[in-house]
Amino acid sequence: MSHKPPKGLYFDIPLSSVYNKGMAETPSMPIIINLERTEKMEKIASFTIDHIKLKPGVYVSRKDHVGAETITTFDLRMTSPNDEPVMNTAEVHTIEHLGATFLRNHPVFGSKTVYFGPMGCRTGFYLLLAGDYESKDIVDLVKEMFIFIRDFKGEVPGASPKDCGNYLDMNLGMANYLAKKYLDEVLADISQDRLVYPE
């Protein structure tokens, strides 16, 4: 009786690399990536947003419940997706260091800050706060943070080989510039259509 293997991609991995490096003979084991399963997976929330209509702004991306606590994820979109050039990694990295430092030291939101970091597409950042918030609730906080980044001079916090895994990939001048652009063009007089995701 023959058994048909499941659909997928097959890779032969030496067992010695998994169990015992040093075996004289290393039989292989098949590693299967099931393509059918990935085809049935639902899109994550951020992939359901129409990025063609999306403008730079401050949006609630999602809300998650962990025990009795609500975690609100904000989309701090700094550039127009697939329209403006994306930010380079050096300035993104600098904004991450400065933004995280500002938030963790904030007198009100410091203890509520779960995470601040860049989107993989390099068009903005995600901010996760403990609590149930709407976009309008954090506009002042985001303004404060980007004023801090715009005006920052000197050594970027954590930009040393001891503190960071890629400390040379920094561009403070461009981080200052992008923070000013976001403040002037988006945050200064933010409209409702930049606080709620497009339909």
Label every model-predicted segment.
Residues 10-11, 19:
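Aromatic (phenylalanine/tyrosine) cluster motif
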Residues 184-199:
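Histidine-acidic residue clusters that define the catalytic metal-binding segment
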Residues 81, 85-137:
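M16/MPP (pitrilysin/insulinase) zinc-metallopeptidase core fold and M16-derived inactive scaffolds
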Residues 116-188:
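Active-site-adjacent, His/Asp/Glu-enriched structural segments that form or flank metal-binding
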